[in-house]
């Protein structure tokens, strides 16, 4: 019971902290006349991935490497299969040609890069599979390249978009209070969440990798799921694609990059199956959008994606 309360309370603090940090930082940036484009691509993007970042970094520091990796791998699988699948069940998703030819292949590439980093035992000179500090720097280098690419395409399309970030205006003292409170919520909530998840793993007799791949991953992805389904209910399901692409790239390149830089991450029970499902889920997202019904992910395909996630999760639990 205590572990469940720690998990729920920690997640609530993390989400509240992420919102506070994002709102406060964006208000300060706006006061210093930083453009909405830069705010959206940096502060807001960081805020949406802050739960995964905090949990993975704290897990790495606490010696729970499997939970750190499982959180990222599981979140990305959840995003690609459950979020896109549930959104398509509400309303079919039309995918732009640029997204199909450029952005989704980047997600596939990120999954392949992670696979190579996880399996380069000889290069790391380790006796076990590990995402080393050097791998972390490689992932962060890819993140910088991705951000440079994102800024370039955003500037090119800025005039066409015409939509600004909705940023709360507030006094400087209030912004600082939001930032400080947000950071405190993220750190304290993250520690509670990691402690609760580790405790549940021990009490249930399951590995931390399974907890990370399922419970932790699903919990940290709930904001993206809620945002995407709400957008579909408002007849704008395409937002889900942007959410998933941005989140998945951020998770692998930045979250895992930072976590591995803080402390090398042995793969442990995160095996070839989990990494293969990660790659397959990215490929499936590309295939259903590219080859069927003129770049539209239909309700039937959405049901297929949700079904794939349910089968994968059931397999993980059955193996314990």
What are these regions (language model features)?
Residues 1-320:
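Hydrophobic alpha-helical segments, chiefly the membrane-spanning helices
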């Amino acid at each position: 019971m205590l572990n469940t309360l720690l998990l729920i309370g920690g997640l609530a603090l993390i989400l509240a902290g992420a919102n506070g940090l994002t709102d406060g930082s964006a208000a300060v940036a706006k006061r210093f006349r930083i453009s909405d484009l830069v705010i959206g691509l940096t502060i807001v993007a960081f805020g949406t991935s802050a739960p995964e970042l905090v949990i993975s970094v704290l897990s790495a520091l606490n010696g729970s490497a499997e939970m750190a990796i499982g959180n990222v791998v599981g979140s990305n699988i959840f995003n690609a299969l459950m979020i896109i699948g549930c959104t398509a069940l509400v309303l079919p998703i039309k995918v732009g040609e640029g997204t199909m030819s450029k952005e989704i292949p980047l997600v596939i590439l990120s999954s392949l890069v992670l696979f190579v980093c996880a399996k380069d035992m000889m290069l790391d000179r380790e006796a076990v599979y590990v995402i080393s500090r050097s791998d972390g720097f490689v992932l962060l280098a890819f993140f910088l390249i991705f951000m440079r690419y994102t800024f370039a395409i955003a500037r090119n399309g800025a005039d066409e978009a015409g939509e600004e970030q909705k940023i709360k205006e507030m006094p400087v003292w209030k912004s600082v209070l939001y930032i400080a409170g947000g950071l405190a919520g993220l750190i304290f909530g993250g520690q509670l969440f990691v402690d609760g998840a580790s405790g549940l793993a021990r009490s249930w007799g399951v590995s931390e990798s399974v907890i990370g791949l399922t419970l932790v991953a699903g919990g940290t992805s709930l904001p993206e799921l809620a945002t995407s389904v709400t957008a579909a209910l408002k007849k704008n399901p395409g937002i889900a694609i942007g959410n998933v692409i941005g989140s998945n790239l951020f998770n692998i390149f930045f979250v895992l990059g930072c976590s591995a830089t803080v402390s090398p991450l042995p793969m442990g029970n995160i095996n070839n199956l989990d990494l293969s499902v990660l790659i397959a889920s990215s490929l499936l997202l590309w295939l259903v959008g590219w080859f069927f019904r003129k770049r539209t992910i239909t309700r039937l395909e959405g049901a297929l994606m949700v079904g794939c996630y349910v089968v994968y999760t059931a397999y993980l639990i059955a193996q314990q």
